[in-house]
């Protein structure tokens, strides 16, 4: 497979023939060229007369050992939770907590081991509030678990370890997101730790410096990576917002400058001005819990955690992508990467949503059996990984959706990759799909949704989105009904509407193409 990935299976025999005909002079020339001091790893072998060895005893009497063994008390296996849309909606306890104003959605169910998953989203501010704030929001969230007024970072880690729980934070301009993974017994303790981190953080300069160093090092290591650079350039070509806007996408130099500008003073100021509940917060808890305890806890502990910044979503409306096909040269990189983006003016609530999702799966969603993977990986044998995906906007106003294609390959195969994408797009648009492809995609999509709803963390995310967009599980049920009713003709019509020839995409190729 390595030779196929390099371009052709017959390279294996060419390699064999070359090895057979190699001369001493050629080997010595290669030594001089490649075995240079800066490309060596040296180790020393120090022999000893009496090496110390470790002997592992072979166990005997295994049958007798296990014959009388009695295990621990059996763990509660939990209930067989029905992930049918109607059942989820019927089990969902939702509403708004009167004192804190938090919108909630709880599913109290008997989980194996009495596990529970919690997600808490706080939204505040508008686009003007977050102008010229750079990357500060992300740094504030990253520092929340690094220490509080009464707990050090180690204290927090020890306390969570003692109750076998985890607490995580993430944030961006306009949003801070907290999550807890725990058990019914330890959820109250985990909530106290999360609350302490969220309401009483202690921003330490040494912890800030560590995060800045890590992120700068990450940028430095990615500065010559074909995939990183190609994605960066694709986004910059389609830059919509001016510098300073929360949705502005900076280049690497600008990202470095933004990171270096972050200070403890900026962190504290951002926290003081934007952390707290204004008029938009949502709480989703799924698993084994005392519902009344959770409601009372958030009422008692977050009614005074206020922000005076009413929330207004930072809009990111649709704009047609720029048609381009650019190369980025990354010397000495064995892998090359191509990514393409095509904008699509549609949203989750549009009638084309179901067919467009299925079209995306057929074109590039499967690991080995999609159009893109079959052509570039199996038929041409030129890609280590190739595919496509459709990203459909949830916002009914922005309608900022897009289609993505990508491939990883050896630089020598760059032209073949371009030809493959070009021809497969043309064939997809002109000829459409088959009934067999449709049936396979429908079954895969429905099974995937069923599995996703059986995972508490993914179900939590789904319910959080429903709360935010003021909808319930009937939205997902309706989408599945639309997917199930799709025909070849409906999908083909959507393909012709949204898929375009390669020359209309924003395509960026990164690799050592010299």
Please annotate each region the language model reported.
Residues 353-354:
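Zinc-dependent metallopeptidase catalytic helix centered on the HExxH motif
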């Amino acid at each position: 497979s390595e030779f196929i990935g390099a371009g052709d299976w017959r390279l294996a025999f060419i390699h064999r023939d070359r090895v057979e005909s190699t001369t001493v002079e050629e080997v010595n020339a290669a030594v001089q060229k490649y075995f240079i001091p800066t490309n060596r790893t040296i180790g020393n072998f120090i022999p000893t007369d009496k090496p110390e060895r470790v002997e592992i005893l072979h166990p005997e009497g295994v049958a007798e050992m296990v014959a009388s063994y009695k295990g621990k008390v059996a763990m509660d296996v939990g209930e067989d939770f029905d992930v049918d849309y109607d059942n989820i909606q019927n089990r969902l306890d939702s509403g708004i907590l009167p004192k804190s104003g938090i919108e909630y959605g709880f599913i109290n169910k008997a989980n194996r081991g009495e596990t529970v998953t919690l997600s808490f989203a706080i939204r505040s501010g508008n686009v003007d509030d977050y102008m010229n704030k750079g990357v500060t929001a992300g740094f504030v969230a990253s520092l929340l678990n690094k220490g509080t007024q009464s707990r050090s970072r180690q204290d927090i880690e020890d306390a969570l370890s003692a109750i076998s729980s985890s607490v995580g934070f993430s944030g961006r301009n306009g949003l801070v997101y907290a999550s807890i993974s725990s058990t019914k017994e330890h959820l109250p303790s985990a909530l106290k730790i999360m609350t302490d981190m969220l309401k009483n953080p202690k921003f330490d300069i040494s912890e800030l410096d560590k995060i800045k160093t890590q992120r700068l090092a990450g940028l430095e290591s990615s500065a010559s990576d074909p995939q990183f650079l190609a994605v960066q350039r694709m986004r910059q070509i389609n830059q919509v917002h001016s510098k300073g806007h929360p949705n502005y996408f900076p280049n690497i130099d600008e990202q470095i400058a933004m990171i270096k500008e972050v200070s403890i003073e900026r962190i504290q100021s951002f926290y003081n001005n934007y952390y707290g509940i204004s008029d938009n917060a949502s709480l989703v808890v799924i698993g084994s819990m005392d519902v009344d305890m959770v409601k009372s806890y958030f009422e008692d502990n977050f009614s005074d955690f206020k922000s005076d910044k009413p929330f207004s979503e930072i809009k990111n409306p649709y704009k047609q992508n720029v048609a381009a096909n650019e190369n980025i040269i990354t010397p000495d990189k064995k892998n090359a990467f191509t990514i393409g983006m095509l904008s699509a003016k549609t949203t989750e609530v549009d009638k084309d949503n179901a067919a467009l999702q299925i079209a995306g799966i057929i074109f590039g969603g499967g690991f080995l059996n999609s159009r893109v993977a079959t052509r570039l990986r199996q038929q041409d044998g030129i890609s280590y990984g190739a595919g496509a995906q459709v990203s459909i906007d949830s916002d009914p106003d922005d309608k900022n959706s897009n289609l993505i294609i990508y491939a990883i390959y050896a630089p020598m195969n760059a032209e073949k990759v371009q030809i493959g994408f070009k021809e497969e797009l043309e064939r997809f648009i002109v000829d459409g799909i088959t009934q067999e492809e449709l049936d396979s995609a429908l079954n895969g999509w429905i099974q995937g949704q069923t599995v996703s709803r059986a995972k508490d963390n993914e179900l939590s995310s789904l319910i959080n989105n429903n709360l935010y967009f003021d909808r319930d599980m009937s939205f997902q049920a309706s989408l599945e009904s639309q997917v199930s009713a799709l025909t070849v003709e409906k999908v083909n019509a959507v393909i012709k509407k949204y898929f375009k020839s390669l020359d209309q995409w924003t395509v960026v190729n990164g690799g050592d193409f010299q």
